[in-house]
Amino acid sequence: KLIEFTNLVNECCSVMEDSYVADWLNKPNPDLNMEVPIDIFREEGMERILRLLYFIEIGEADV
């Protein structure tokens, strides 16, 4: 799980400012039905979050 978390943080850093990643992971996100990304990671894994990061990267979702 630690390696997966590290990979998740690296993915986040590739699409947003490094200094914002911790806040982003711990705040309810409207693009995730107001769920908290880190909670989704713990309960489901990375897939939904990686999909959102992709949409952020291509400009289809906001950070």
Where in this protein do the model-derived segments appear?
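Non-transmembrane "mature" sequence context
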Residues: K1-V63
